[in-house]
Amino acid sequence: MELYDIHTHQILLEDNDDPYQTCILDVYPLEFEVAKVTYQRHSFSCGIHPWYSEDSDYQLKYLSEIASDPRIIAIGETGLDKIKGPDFDIQIPVFKRHIELSEQLKKPLIIHAVKAWEELYHIRKEANPTQPWILHGFRGNSQIAQQMSKVGFLFSLGERFNVDALEFIPNDALFCETDESEITILEVYQQIASVLNQDIEDFASQIAKNVQRVFPTLEKPEELKI
């Protein structure tokens, strides 16, 4: 069984060389040069969180300079947040700059979304992107899952998720993550597989296929036997 954590902010040093999991570590642009030396087994997503999109011109400029690095395999996390962060007239242009980078470099987009489903829905329809857009830490309800799935969003689930929404997330649109939680990626797999009433090996196999399709350059972990 191969384990993939497509969005995490923390890799414990003792887990850095764990051969049984492969992670995509989320970093800010100015953190990347140090992180790529510290975490040599892992790949990165790099972007500016919507909470910090105000006065982000320098980080955006630097992101555009480093985002072509092959160790950066996704752009973000970026996105829209109605609860925290600057006004949307600041967040939206920064988000759209990430969309442009994603398309230019042909790298998937990792999206943070809080109560901004309608805006994201319309921005995606307008942008008509060629690259995958992944809603990380998705906790939306079944109606939101169905709506966003129809226009091509992918979904990454972590420790907390809406059980009812799983019915409306296609198997080939599902990913797993730990984000900032203290549980392991194996525990996330086990939770979701249990809700879906799927064998853990079968579930992990489907997630592996999804990851390898969307992130073809991501290093494969060794198989974990449980």
Identify what each model region corresponds to.
Residues 1-226:
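Mid-domain alpha/beta scaffold segments of enzyme catalytic cores
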